Design a protein with these regions (language model features):
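Repeated loop/turn-to-beta-strand initiation elements of outer-membrane beta-barrel proteins
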Residues: 37-43, 76-81, 107-110, 127-130, ...
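Outer-membrane beta-barrel "beta-signal"
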Residues: 97-103, 163, 202-223
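Outer-membrane beta-barrel translocator/channel fold
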Residues: 4-21, 114-208
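Transmembrane beta-barrel domains of bacterial outer-membrane proteins
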Residues: 1-55, 62
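Transmembrane beta-strand segments that form the barrel wall of outer-membrane beta-barrel proteins
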Residues: 41-51, 77-87, 95-118, 134-136
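Hydrophobic, lipid-facing positions within transmembrane beta-strands of outer-membrane proteins
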Residues: 23-29, 45-49, 61-67, 94-98, ...
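Transmembrane beta-barrel outer-membrane domains
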Residues: 18-24, 56-62, 72, 89-93, ...
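Residue-level signature of outer-membrane beta-barrel architecture
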Residues: 33, 71, 102, 112, ...
Length: 223
């Protein structure tokens, strides 16, 4: 189980944008099923409200799911194969997932779920983990009625430094700080009230996340 909140504050160097904030509030619920010593199944359901939060309604709601099989080759190597789905405002977003998990040493781990995420993580204490993450994401935000309920499509590539601190084997405090070297926007289904150029010329900005989540880590469960 987990929850997250993201807020994108838009800033234009030349003038003020018509849309100044895009926000997303999400709840994740997932589980891990061990089939045998070598195979496991992971599932995750994500429910999200994603919009400018001007006039909230059921039109701002999205639902998604992730599922994959994990094969453990040995105590240091795992591979994953699965599928990602999210109901975006332009329609369903579906693509395959190829994952890996390499234990490089007692404290160093390299893992990812391609094409969306790659992590390099170092265990700094019994409960603390420090890492570097690469994210690629395409998502959408519903606009208010004054913009004809159009939506903004965002594509971004992010680099993040993060820290996780486990209060116990499942509950963790997390924080992240990073930068998006690539961020692009497109606007769809509007009536001309919001010119496209108002979103494509924004300066890339620093970002930060913090929160509390319930996570199941196989390496902690095995200890």
């Amino acid at each position: 189980f987990g929850a997250g909140y993201n807020k994108l504050s838009l800033k234009n160097s030349s003038n003020q944008p018509l849309v100044s904030n895009l926000e997303a509030l999400s709840i994740q619920l997932g589980g891990l099923i061990n089939v045998d010593n070598d195979w496991s199944i992971t599932t995750l359901i994500v429910q999200k409200i994603s919009s400018d939060f001007e006039d909230l309604s059921k039109k701002d709601y999205q639902i998604g799911a992730v599922g994959f099989l994990t094969k453990q080759l040995n105590e240091h190597v795992k591979y994953k194969l699965g599928l990602f789905y999210n109901q975006e405002f332009w329609g369903p977003q579906i693509f395959p997932i190829l994952g890996f998990d390499f234990i490089l040493s007692d404290k160093l781990r390299f893992f990812g779920l391609l094409p969306r995420m790659i992590n390099l993580e170092y265990q700094i204490s019994k409960s603390g983990y420090l890492g570097f993450k690469f994210n690629m994401k395409r998502t959408s935000y519903r606009l208010a009625q004054q913009y004809a309920h159009g939506y903004v499509q965002e594509f971004k590539i992010e680099t993040q430094a993060y820290i996780d601190y486990y209060l116990n084997d499942k509950v963790t405090l997390y924080g992240a700080f990073g930068y998006a070297p690539i961020r692009k926007y497109k606007i769809f289904e509007t009536t001309g009230l919001l010119p496209k150029d108002n979103l494509v010329k924004f300066d890339n900005q620093l970002m930060a996340h913090a929160g509390l989540a319930i996570r199941i880590r196989s390496d902690r469960a095995e200890k």
